[in-house]
């Protein structure tokens, strides 16, 4: 007989972006804006990063990038370390706390 248990894991993350990383984000956003304005195809993730930058400013774009990075890191961690037949992971929910 198999035993199935469900767990919910929750923790807070505080991140401080240094000036160099902030400048790299601004350069990427500017590049995306130029590419989008020229009619080039950009990935859906980059498109959303640009939308966040235009609607919520650099802080919104940074928050979006961090949320996506955390989701990807959690997913990759479980893909690398777990037996997929034993463990199932739902999509990680990452939200900004004000």
UniProtKB/Swiss-Prot annotation:
The organism's place on the tree of life at top rank: Viruses
Protein name as it appears in the record: Gene 5.5 protein
The organism of origin for this protein: Enterobacteria phage T3 (Bacteriophage T3)
Originating gene: 5.5
């Amino acid at each position: 007989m198999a035993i199935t248990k469900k767990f919910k894991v929750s923790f807070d993350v505080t991140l401080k972006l240094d000036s160099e990383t902030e400048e790299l984000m601004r350069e990427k956003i500017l590049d995306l804006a130029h590419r989008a304005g020229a009619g080039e195809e950009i990935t859906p993730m980059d498109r959303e990063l640009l939308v966040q930058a235009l609607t919520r400013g650099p802080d919104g774009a940074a928050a979006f990038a961090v949320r996506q990075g955390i989701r990807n890191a959690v997913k990759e961690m479980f893909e690398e370390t777990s037996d997929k037949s034993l463990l199932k992971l739902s999509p990680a929910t990452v939200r900004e706390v004000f």
